[in-house]
Amino acid sequence: MGPLWALRVAGALSVAGVLAGHDGSQRAGQPAALDAGTRGDGVGHDRGVDCREVRKRNSSERCRFVRGTPDCRLDGGFLDYLGGAFCTFPSSLLPLSVSLYALWLLYLFVILGVTAEKFFCPNLSAISTNLKLSHNGLGVVGHSLTPALHGVTFLAFGNGAPDIFSAVVAFSDPRTAGLAVGAIFGAGIFVTTVVAGGIALVKPFAAASRPFLRDVIFYMVAVFLTFLVLYFGYITLGEALGYLGLYVFYVFTVVLCTWIHRWQRGDGPPPPGPWEPAIPTDAEEQESSGTNCGDYGEEYRPLLPYHETSLHILSTALSPLDKHKWRRKPWYWRLFKVLKVPVELVLLLTVPVVDPDKDDLNWKRPLNCLHIVTGPLLCIFTLKSGAYGLYQIQGVFPVWALVALAGSVLAIIVFVTTHNEEPPKYHCVFAFLGFLSSAMWINAAATELVNILRTLGIIFELSNTVLGLTLLAWGNSIGDTFSDLTMARQGYPRMAFSACFGGIIFNILVGVGLGCLLQMTNSQMVVKLEPDSLLVWILAGALGLSLVFSFVAVPAQCFQLGKAYGTCLILYYLVFLCVALLTEFRVIHLAAT
């Protein structure tokens, strides 16, 4: 009763805060209401001529229109996709440019996945270990609570990094805010229907009652708050902070529920929450021992130790291929690995990885010294599309040269004062550098992803919302889909099912809260989120209805989930997708008033 009572109070306070933030007449500094505008983008924005008008122009005028229309300017990013489609390529080759953009879009999802899995998550785990969260995270609470705290904070951030960065980038421009709304809601309904339903089809199981009800209630509260924000048309500073505060309260509730269960059961291990795996059996340990966050440097080690030269260490560390794994893997794995090699090689050159599970903590002396130079250079060249790196001090000395010089001096000092065989005491600092560098890579890839989706939306005259709930949501959720279904096949459907609902809570609360918070300035403490399309309301309503269905159906089945439940969820998503596409193409629309 304690956690549920606290949840009711928090929900009431959150709703009251949203309503209080929107009562009365328009306040000073509050954005004026916007007209719906042409061709709904899902979330309104104040603009002149819509860039989608380019398709109505003659072929000879399209390049001039794109160059001269403010709405066609893509903020951030390194490539001008609209200019490439309408200026670089002739109009007769537009299908070719679209095909190239589609392939590049798929590869961007590969970049996001590889960066998050192989570099961002391991460094985040190393930071958690260095902060002692994996040993005595809460002191007074006890050791067994720490996995829950670690899971809903560090692990949630690691798994949701592509979604969060995509949302932050999309919210940075009112023209692409519909992408963020569509992706957050679209991924939510996809994961809670298709992925959750697939788990029930693959492996019928009994769901954990209290964690399931807790997560669904929190997610319904988050969806309802977002619905209110969209209804009133803007989000204030207090409301953005309220999103983040609600997630902090969710973390507190998870830890409290774990502590209560442990107290009731004595000193036994707590049940697995949405982010913490159950204590593995011997067979499970054998299975998990063959996997690791990173598969670099996993060559078989000789029985007798020997001293490797720095050149050999560098060449081995920069090789993304493991010849032993390559021989025993199927052809399709090899093909995908070949596609990932260029990305992995660039990441290996610029992002250090600290692995607490290895004896040497993945200390590669020559490569880590190189990272001291390449990591900071990466950061300044990815900020503002390289604008900071090209800035010249006093109009003479470029910033990138100063960073390279300072990094080189520091790298030489580290190389001279360390050894190949033993990591230095300050090796944990490389985890923070790796975290920052991988975050910059994810942010850069997310920026390109948002820009190319907006370009495809302009070319095909599609709204940002439908692109967000389809391509962006599917791309960001594909990793969770495969991992959860694989986990279910291996005999852990309860853990996979809990992850479906627990993970998306982080995405919606932190994605909306942090994404809007970062766009606020001292002069404008509000972010406009006015939906000007029926599709936004269909998306929000469909997500809310799916959560209500699960909230009622799962307890009605005594938490025994089988193929009937899974089939209903997947059919529900297919019906929703058909309605969404029919709405996008104006087959379903509101009657004119």
UniProtKB/Swiss-Prot annotation:
Compositional bias of kind Pro residues: 268-277
GO molecular function, a single term: calcium:sodium antiporter activity involved in regulation of cardiac muscle cell membrane potential
Topological domain spans for side Extracellular: 21-93, 159-178, 237-239, 356-369, 417-428, 476-496, 555-564
Annotated signal sequence range: 1-20
Residue pairs linked by disulfide bridges in the UniProt entry: none
Residues glycosylated per entry: 58
Alphabetically ordered keywords of this record: Antiport, Calcium, Calcium transport, Glycoprotein, Ion transport, Lithium, Membrane, Mitochondrion, Mitochondrion inner membrane, Sensory transduction, Signal, Sodium, Sodium transport, Transmembrane, Transmembrane helix, Transport
Cellular compartments annotated: Mitochondrion inner membrane
PANTHER family: MITOCHONDRIAL SODIUM_CALCIUM EXCHANGER PROTEIN, NA+/CA2+ K+ INDEPENDENT EXCHANGER
The protein's name: Mitochondrial sodium/calcium exchanger protein
Organism in which the protein naturally occurs: Gallus gallus
